């Protein structure tokens, strides 16, 4: 991934710089998240855009037809540039790196929350408030994942900190406590 990061970072930094200068960084970040969801959920799109058979002009035309109406001009220009330079295969890395940089400069903590079932709005808000205290910032972005194999509870990862409030985690801690007694 380091090579991909060295390719992605200059493009990400440029997009962020232009978006910040135009006052569109939050809008661009939201568009990046939406495009990432589409990219990750559509193998057909990924395969077509990373295909060596499809010419850069065809890729660019397809991307513009699909996304130009919904994206800021800076974001649209990034897609064109990646297509022109035959770097569209690095799109996911560029977008992920953009979000990292955006969160860094806006001091937004990313909390990955894995739960056994989807959380309701009240649970999300309560969790967000607790994470704000742990992360030391009022800006918290939740990335919610559902893993039914957890049975119950949740696990929160913020940076290098992990809070395991899962049923399996509680059983494991209980087992360790009993092992120390015996």
UniProtKB/Swiss-Prot annotation:
InterPro entries: ATP_synth_OSCP/delta_N_sf (IPR026015), ATPase_OSCP/dsu (IPR000711). Its main location: plastid. Keywords: ATP synthesis, CF(1), Hydrogen ion transport, Ion transport, Membrane, Organellar chromatophore, Plastid, Thylakoid, Transport. It is found in: Plastid, Organellar chromatophore thylakoid membrane. It comes from the Eukaryota. It holds the Pfam family OSCP. GO terms for cellular component: organellar chromatophore thylakoid membrane; plastid; proton-transporting ATP synthase complex. It is a peripheral membrane protein. SUPFAM superfamilies: N-terminal domain of the delta subunit of the F1F0-ATP synthase. GO terms for molecular function: proton-transporting ATP synthase activity, rotational mechanism. F-type ATPases have 2 components, F(1) - the catalytic core - and F(0) - the membrane proton channel. F(1) has five subunits: alpha(3), beta(3), gamma(1), delta(1), epsilon(1). CF(0) has four main subunits: a(1), b(1), b'(1) and c(10-14). The alpha and beta chains form an alternating ring which encloses part of the gamma chain. F(1) is attached to F(0) by a central stalk formed by the gamma and epsilon chains, while a peripheral stalk is formed by the delta, b and b' chains. HAMAP family: ATP_synth_delta_bact (MF_01416). F(1)F(0) ATP synthase produces ATP from ADP in the presence of a proton or sodium gradient. F-type ATPases consist of two structural domains, F(1) containing the extramembraneous catalytic core and F(0) containing the membrane proton channel, linked together by a central stalk and a peripheral stalk. During catalysis, ATP synthesis in the catalytic domain of F(1) is coupled via a rotary mechanism of the central stalk subunits to proton translocation. Belongs to the ATPase delta chain family. This is ATP synthase subunit delta, organellar chromatophore. It comes from Paulinella chromatophora. The lineage of its organism: Eukaryota, Sar, Rhizaria, Cercozoa, Imbricatea.
């Amino acid at each position: 991934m380091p090579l991909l990061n060295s390719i992605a970072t200059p493009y990400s930094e440029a997009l962020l710089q232009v978006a910040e200068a135009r006052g569109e960084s939050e809008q661009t970040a939201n568009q990046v998240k939406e495009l990432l969801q589409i990219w990750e959920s559509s193998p057909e799109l990924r395969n077509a855009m990373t295909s060596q058979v499809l010419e850069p002009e065809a890729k660019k035309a397809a991307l513009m037809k699909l996304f130009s109406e919904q994206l800021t001009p800076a974001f649209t220009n990034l897609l064109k540039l990646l297509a022109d330079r035959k770097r569209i295969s690095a799109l996911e890395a560029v977008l992920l790196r953009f979000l990292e940089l955006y969160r860094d400069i806006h001091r937004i903590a990313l909390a990955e929350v894995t739960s056994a079932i989807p959380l309701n709005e009240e649970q999300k808000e309560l969790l967000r408030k607790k994470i704000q205290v742990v992360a030391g910032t009022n800006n918290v972005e939740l990335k919610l994942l559902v893993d039914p194999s957890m049975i119950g509870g949740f696990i929160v990862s913020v940076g290098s900190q992990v809070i395991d409030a899962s049923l399996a985690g509680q059983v494991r801690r209980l087992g360790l406590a009993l092992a120390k007694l015996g």
